[in-house]
């Protein structure tokens, strides 16, 4: 198949865009021709470079929803943009178009473009939380606009886990086709893990006895880096050999540095900034502490599981993922219980092993690419059948 993957252009470093990279790789390995349509904004340059070796990159003049002051209210009326984009997509003659959106209101003009060009399409939405849930400005109006545009979309709307798909169905009251396809990450070579772990820990100046707790993600409110900091302070009191390392950058970086200094955690808590390759850090760590406020199915978490790292999350988050349980995940809600498990190597090895098996069985790039491949075939067949009926 000739597959056109479309980014709404929110950036190169978020999980949603890394998902697009993994999917493109997986589809290429399955011998499909992958085209990747990326907005020409400089923030997309990094993703374009990383994907150029396995996909044909197309840069286009397109403005992301969050580059408009009025957000989705602005994209609600930009029919000219949608028609221009539709014409460009149609000229590429893809068999199927796959639009990748961060949230409900992001890229609604791209869904309109898909309707206009008539090519079979699907759309992945990573976060299906409403603007009202997020307490955004003009939330009611923005939710109404998103509901209206999503309900008019004739393709399949894909959520990345069942809980998010259920919310999407309820929001649209059954007026759109919805489906769950789980995110996937590449397989990690277990043999390479041990050699790279030793080298990375030496580079970071870590002692063999240090227990390294990682945070992974952008330094933004959604990821709750200051909750990570509070957890670090509490865990350090009870586990003095613990060291805490945040891997990522963002708008809260300066505030984070001041908070570390204010809490006198220099030498205990540090930040590695943005890293193009997080795998060596995952190898060097002993635990991933994931405390984000809201998520879809975070790639950081399943990348850590694939690398054999035990992971700790909130019970609220784990309740949305039915295959997360006490065998393959730890919980941050009870600090004393977490401290006891941190001190038990047998428990950590068991949880890490179960997490790694979970990724291999359910959350691999291979499984994700195969599931999307089948969905593409289904929407192409459905479109062909509809054309036959209308012409008959």
Predicted regions and their residues:
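A short, active-site helix/loop in glycosyltransferases that binds the activated sugar's phosphate group
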Residues: 151-180, 185-187, 321
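A short, well-ordered alpha-helix in the C-terminal region of glycosyltransferases
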Residues: 347-362, 368-374
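Aromatic "clamp/platform" in nucleotide-sugar-dependent glycosyltransferases that forms part
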Residues: 102, 274, 293
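Short hydrophobic beta-strand element within catalytic cores of glycosyltransferases
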Residues: 310-314
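Conserved acidic donor-binding segment of nucleotide-sugar-dependent glycosyltransferases
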Residues: 324-336, 343-346
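A conserved mid-protein helix/loop that constitutes part of the nucleotide-sugar donor-binding site
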Residues: 14-25, 211-234, 251-257
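An aromatic- and histidine-rich active-site surface loop
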Residues: 81-82, 97-117
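Nucleotide-activated donor-binding/catalytic signature segment of Leloir-type glycosyltransferases, i.e.
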Residues: 257-273
């Amino acid at each position: 198949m000739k597959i056109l993957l479309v980014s709404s252009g929110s950036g190169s470093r978020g999980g949603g865009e890394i998902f697009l990279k993994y999917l493109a790789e997986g589809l290429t390995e399955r011998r499909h021709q992958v085209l990747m349509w990326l907005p020409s904004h400089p923030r997309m340059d990094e993703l374009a470079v990383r994907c150029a070796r396995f996909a044909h990159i197309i840069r286009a003049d397109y403005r992301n929803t969050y580059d408009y002051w009025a957000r989705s209210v602005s994209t609600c009326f930009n029919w000219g943009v949608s028609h221009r984009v539709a014409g460009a997509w149609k000229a590429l003659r893809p068999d199927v178009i796959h639009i990748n959106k961060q949230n409900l209101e992001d890229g609604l003009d791209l869904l309109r473009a898909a309707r206009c060009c008539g090519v079979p399409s699907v759309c992945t939405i990573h976060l299906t939380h409403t603007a009202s849930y997020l307490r955004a400005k003009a939330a009611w109006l923005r939710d109404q606009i998103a509901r209206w545009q999503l309900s008019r979309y004739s393709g399949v709307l894909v959520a990345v886990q069942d809980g998010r798909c259920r919310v999407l169905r309820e929001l649209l009251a059954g007026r759109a086709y919805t489906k769950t396809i789980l995110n996937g990450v590449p397989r990690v070579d277990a043999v390479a893990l041990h050699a790279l772990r030793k080298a990375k820990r030496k580079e970071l100046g870590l002692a063999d006895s240090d227990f390294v707790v990682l945070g992974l993600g952008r330094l933004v409110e959604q990821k709750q880096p200051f909750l990570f900091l509070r957890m670090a302070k509490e865990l350090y009191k009870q586990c003095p050999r613990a060291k805490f390392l945040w891997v990522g950058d963002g708008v809260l970086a300066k505030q984070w540095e001041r908070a570390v200094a204010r809490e006198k955690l220099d030498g205990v808590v540090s930040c590695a900034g943005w890293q193009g390759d997080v795998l060596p850090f995952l190898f060097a760590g002993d635990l991933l502490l994931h405390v984000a406020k809201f998520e879809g199915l975070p790639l950081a978490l399943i990348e850590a599981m694939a690398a054999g790292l035990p992971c700790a999350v909130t019970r609220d988050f784990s309740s949305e993922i039915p295959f997360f349980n006490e065998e393959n995940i730890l919980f941050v809600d009870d600090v004393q219980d977490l401290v006891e498990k941190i001190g038990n190597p047998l428990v950590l090895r068991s949880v890490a092993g179960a997490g790694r098996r979970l990724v291999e069985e359910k959350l691999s790039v291979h499984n994700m690419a195969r599931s999307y491949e089948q969905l593409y075939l289904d929407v192409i067949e459905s479109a062909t059948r509809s054309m036959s009926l209308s012409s008959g």
